[in-house]
Amino acid sequence: CGIYMVEYVMLENSSGYTDKYEICKSITYKEGIKKGGTQAMKILVTGGAGYIGSHTCVELLEAGYDVVIVDNLYNASEKAVDRIGQITGKTPTFYEADIRDYEKMTEIFAKEQPDTVIHFAGLKAVGESVRKPLEYYENNIAGTLNLCKVMRENGCKNIIFSSSATVYGNPAFIPITEECPKGVCTNPYGWTKHMLEQILTDIHFA
């Protein structure tokens, strides 16, 4: 009942709080992420054609995972998917789709039956979020809720969520640790990430 594996992936911002490449490696080699036996785990990566997403897909493919990319190409290009194939010698399955599209996401999950989702998809510009708060709340929060609903309906209980250092607002201290207070965000983008952390935590404990 609900999603039982939730991880927050803190991404690098202008202050360089976290190293993105090391995050990709830690995701790839995390103990327990592979299936038993010889069958490769299938991982669906939302926003997989973006910068962080595409680098993560390279690491996953090179580690032997099956990768399915879902990206609406709002801030990415299908050329990134081609480049992933060139780098790894393996072609990931790609769907141009929006995570808010319930019917399309249901179709993808029914066909692919992923074991795990790594969730990068979402609007991500701090300044733009101040000008377009409705778009950010609708895209990031409603999109993730739709994704979680489709996951539940298809028996996929593992999600790794890409959060952001913006959840700390103006941090109480630097360098930031997990003990740093959260929830005093300074922009709508940060609030979407903070709210989603809470939503996923609630789903985890349901």
Locate each region found by the language model.
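Serine residues within intrinsically disordered or low-complexity segments
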Residues: S14-S15, S26
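Short, Lys/Arg-enriched N-terminal segments with co-localized hydrophobic residues
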Residues: K20-A40
